[in-house]
Amino acid sequence: MPKNIPLSQTISITAIASVSPLGNESDTIWTNYQNPNTCFQTRFLDHKDTLVAPLDADSKEQIDALRQSDSKYKFLDNSVLYAMLASRKAIAKAGWTTNDIFGINVGSSRGATDLFEQHFQEYITTGKAQTLASPTTTLGNISSWIAHDLQSSGPEISHSITCSTALHAILNGVAWLRSGMADKFLVGGSEAPLTDFTIAQMRALKIYSRSEEEYPNRALDLDKTQNTMILGEGAGVCCLEIGKKENALAFIEGIGYATEILEHNISISAEADC
């Protein structure tokens, strides 16, 4: 059953930041939103040319610079680096510093899939696993590295709720703030799923786009006769604070959640009811 819960105290969203194919700065993102052209590119994945939406050139440069900024960062998955860059931008906008105590909950659905696939392929080939294979591919990898990068001393949580991961991070952040156990929380999600195995999984589900039209992703076309999903990559985070803040971009005044009774292993019904 869905639950709608009024908040006893308003939560302020004091900053939002993202890294995606649309860019990583507000002006660039808005300009690309207004561009009628897509951000799709063709990559050879899962043994064939595949449309995907990778990061824009500027974001890739910033990610590369971040990767080179610390010797430990060279071994991290892109999903971690995307979240780290977005988190840096968010707390800068919110005015948070290392003196602030804030929690972190940034999750991921696919997790460190690119790095995991590389490590698994090496194991299949050599029969040996690298020392860093486990610590760099665990689910807790994202929030813990963000905490390290931002020198945060608050609680850090990682989780995966399939397609609702980032929204559940907001729910978790609100719960922590309402409980009085934190005054500030950094929440969001990160995905870097443009890999052979991930694309193969989406094709096995029959949901990946096979269209060669000008707009191959028909997300708003309710009359389409086939699935047209195209994977992208990126991270989005926001800064939450308890109470009404003067610098708030928006306020959270209510939250909700629901649990679905599954009819099928891949969470679909016979008539595709939502």
Residue ranges of model-derived segments:
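Condensing-enzyme catalytic core mediating Claisen C-C bond formation in acyl metabolism
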Residues: 5-16, 26-27, 31-50, 213-274
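Short glycine-aspartate micro-motif
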Residues: 10-13, 101-105, 182-187, 219, ...
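Conserved beta-ketoacyl condensing-enzyme motif
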Residues: 13, 37-160, 193-198
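Cytochrome P450 core scaffold surrounding the K-helix E-X-X-R motif
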Residues: 22-24
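A glycine- and small-aliphatic-rich helix-loop capping segment at beta-alpha/alpha-beta transitions
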Residues: 27-31, 117-129, 146, 176-179, ...
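Active-site pocket-shaping loop/turn-to-helix segments
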Residues: 67-85, 130-138, 157-168, 219-236, ...
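Active-site-proximal alpha-helical scaffold in enzymes
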Residues: 83-93, 139-142, 147-150, 155-191, ...
